[in-house]
């Protein structure tokens, strides 16, 4: 037996013997070399289609929600030719029940409803629109984010919660859009990124990731991503049906039926889905 083999065996024996004593720890995946514990990876969840509904392929979806049984959508307009809209839609048929067109200088973005009042963000115009449920404009309110952009919008029942495509969530006082706090989102210890359309579901914030097929489930108490939902199979199905369909974007939750819906920009379908392990 060579000297090298003997040395290896002796070293292995000594290491094994030393680990019988307190203070000897394995350097596993939960710890870095400096002994600090790494944050856990988010749980991976699947997304199963329960039902499919028609969706207007001209809708560049930026905001999606269900309020008192009604489906509402905010659309953007990359060409700024007057296609940014606020819509109320019949879920089963996909037909528009009510429509408001934004001035073509605005790019429609995130959408939420709080206490019968509709709030709609704009992309780079730093303006939020406030409406009644029948789409009568109440006022325009300036708002601010770190990069000056508005992307997703939701509410926890007290505050309006927005993002700007970065890793940050912004909490606003609803009547004034005064910034209350900023919450950084972290994914396995690293800053999250590309946060887009938002939805608040049973105490968690769900966020699409722009240009990715994931939805992030975020704990609002600390900004930690606790789970990731993979929509790759749904996106592939949509692309096969319509190659012009854009990225995944749009999460809606019906608190009465407990049903979740997802769609994307210019998608031909909107899906009722279920998240599971």
Where are the predicted features?
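Beta-strand-rich domains and repeat architectures in extracellular enzymes and scaffolds
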Residues: 50-85, 99-112, 151-152, 264-268
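Conserved beta-strand positions in repeat-built beta-propeller and related beta-rich domains
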Residues: 73-80, 119-125, 162-166, 207-211, ...
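C-terminal motif of bacterial Sec signal peptides marking the signal peptidase cleavage site
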Residues: 20-23
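A short helix->beta-strand "capping" segment at the edge of beta-propeller domains
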Residues: 36-58, 91-97
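Beta-rich, blade/repeat-based domains predominating
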Residues: 57-68, 104-114, 145-157, 189-201, ...
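Short loop/turn segments that connect beta-strands within beta-propeller blades
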Residues: 90-94, 132-136, 173-177, 219-223, ...
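Blade-loop segments of beta-propeller domains
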Residues: 93-123, 127-129, 137-147
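Surface-exposed loop and turn segments in beta-propeller and other repeat-based domains
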Residues: 50-55, 97-104, 143-144, 182-191, ...
